[in-house]
Amino acid sequence: MTRLLIVGPPGAGKGTQAKRIAADRGIPDVSTGDIFRQNIKDRTELGQQVQALVDAGNYVPDELTNRLVTVRLQEEDAQAGFLLDGYPRTLAQVAYLEELLQGWGQELDAVIQLVADEDEVVARLTRRAAEQGRADDGEDEIRHRQEVYVRETSPLIDVYREHGLLVEVDGLGEVDEVAERIRTALAARGVRPSSDAGRA
């Protein structure tokens, strides 16, 4: 059973690597964005609450996000483990997740932090925006998103570092190269791919 969490700044390829790690280990890539969209699409009770908040231009509060994640982690495909992407985002969510897993007799195996030089990431995203014709995605906006990421995730990263769970990996480079770095870093912690990954 493998229980992982991945964090990384915009432009560091977190979404791509999350899918690779999940496929490698035969576990679901659990993204809060996907959970919100699926619940809205399925018109679940919680999904309708999310839709109302989004329509009003409000953030989804911790309590509702926590409930949605709890329901998702109880689904059959997450029983052999999971990779969380985009959750937790606040210290309250960190505490909730720890308590939730403890209640199930579980704990996180590792927190993968993709690290990347800010100037390189900004250059990469600026090029991508120009190629895709997104003139509104200028360097100032991109740098602002990097600053928000650092401000929001630094306290979470500090907690996971104190818990001895943090695995730092250079997120820049070819997709396969970064994936191999992650695999090596996790193996060094004793977190290896499931031998039956992908057979289900």
Swiss-Prot record:
UniProt pathway annotation: Purine metabolism; AMP biosynthesis via salvage pathway; AMP from ADP: step 1/1
Keyword list, A-Z: ATP-binding, Cytoplasm, Kinase, Nucleotide biosynthesis, Nucleotide-binding, Transferase
Cellular compartment(s): Cytoplasm
Residues that coordinate or bind ATP: G11, A12, G13, K14, G15, T16, R128, G173
Region described as LID: 127-137
GO MF annotation terms: adenylate kinase activity; ATP binding
Gene Ontology cellular component list: cytoplasm
Record-level GO BP terms: AMP salvage
SUPFAM superfamilies attached to this UniProt entry: P-loop containing nucleoside triphosphate hydrolases
Domain of life of the source: Bacteria
Isomerase listed as a keyword: no
E.C. code: 2.7.4.3
InterPro entries reported for this sequence: Adenylat/UMP-CMP_kin, Adenylat_kinase_CS, P-loop_NTPase
Catalysed reactions listed for this entry: AMP + ATP = 2 ADP
Chief localization: cytoplasm
Region annotation (NMP) ranges: 31-60
Binding site for AMP: T32, R37, N58, Y59, V60, G86, Y87, P88, R89, Q93, R134, R145
Pfam family, one: ADK
Quaternary structure, from the entry: Monomer.
Function: Catalyzes the reversible transfer of the terminal phosphate group between ATP and AMP. Plays an important role in cellular energy homeostasis and in adenine nucleotide metabolism.
Stated family: Belongs to the adenylate kinase family.
Domain notes: Consists of three domains, a large central CORE domain and two small peripheral domains, NMPbind and LID, which undergo movements during catalysis. The LID domain closes over the site of phosphoryl transfer upon ATP binding. Assembling and dissambling the active center during each catalytic cycle provides an effective means to prevent ATP hydrolysis.
Cited HAMAP family: Adenylate_kinase_Adk (MF_00235)
Protein name (record): Adenylate kinase
Lineage: Bacteria, Bacillati, Actinomycetota, Actinomycetes, Micrococcales
